[in-house]
Structures are given as structure tokens and as C-alpha cells.
Swiss-Prot record:
Entry-linked SUPFAM superfamilies: Restriction endonuclease-like (SSF52980)
HAMAP family listed in its UniProt record: UPF0102
Gene3D superfamilies according to UniProt: 3.40.1350.10
GO molecular function: nucleic acid binding
Name listed for the protein in its UniProt record: UPF0102 protein NFA_41430
Length: 127
């Protein structure tokens, strides 16, 4: 099904975000990354995607927007959001068997402008 058709049916922010996360996960897999976890939750919040790229574990925040009226999707990852993601990453790592040689924090920006194909941008190690 074409993304434009799916976008036409996406009526609320939650569905738009879920579709953006699916596109982001597919994009990362196509780039050779392994998706380790999706929507990992604890009482303090949620991590969108956790992926592995060789010896690096990437904690990936996915931001999806319909347009640029409020800035790029990546600009929505505020200082407060970055701090929360760092804390959640430590909690996730504490639950795993490790060892974790390297970690990084990525942002995948998904811009879904009506009538156009989604534009996906993977920003590595941005915070």
C-alpha cells in the first residue's frame, strides 16, 4: 500500500507516530541495523527503538511530522526529552546481559507531507 494512501487514513497523532516508527524501523533494518526492541516501556517512560549496528547499541528517538510548520521533526527532541532518553537507556541497559561496548543516541526524522513520499533522515550520535 502506498504511503500516501496510508497517510490519508492516519487521522490522529498516535497513529501517525506509530506509522513513522514502522517506517523508521524498516529504514534502519535496510541500512543493516538489527532492531533489538521497539517501544520499550517502564514506569518512567518509553524508548522508541533500540538497535544494534556492529558493536554499538543505538537508542533511537523517532519523530514524525506532517509538515514543517512547527520545525523539523528532529527539532522536537528537546533538552528535557534527551535527558529522559538517557535515563531510560541506563535503565534498559541495567536489565540486559551486556557487555555494552559502545552506545549512542540517534534521532530518525520522518516527514510525511501529504501527496509526497515520506522523507526519512537518520541522525547518528546527535546527543
Amino acid at each position: 500500500m502506498a504511503s500516501a494512501t496510508i497517510l490519508a487514513r492516519v487521522g490522529d497523532k498516535q497513529a501517525l507516530g506509530a506509522h513513522g516508527e514502522e517506517l523508521a524501523a524498516r529504514f534502519l533494518r535496510d541500512a543493516g541495523m538489527e532492531i533489538v526492541a521497539r517501544n520499550w516501556r517502564c514506569r518512567y517512560g518509553e524508548l522508541d527503538l533500540i538497535a544494534r549496528d556492529a558493536q554499538t547499541t543505538a537508542f533511537v528517538e523517532v519523530k514524525t511530522r506532517r509538515g514543517l510548520g512547527f520545525g523539523t521533526p528532529a527539532e522536537a527532541v528537546t533538552f528535557t526529552k534527551r535527558q529522559r532518553i538517557r535515563r531510560l537507556a541506563l535503565l534498559w541497559l541495567a536489565e540486559q546481559d551486556g557487555p555494552w561496548q559502545q552506545i549512542r543516541f540517534d534521532v530518525v526524522s520522518v516527514l510525511m507531507t501529504p501527496g509526497h513520499r515520506p522523507v526519512i533522515d537518520h541522525l547518528k550520535a546527535v546527543f
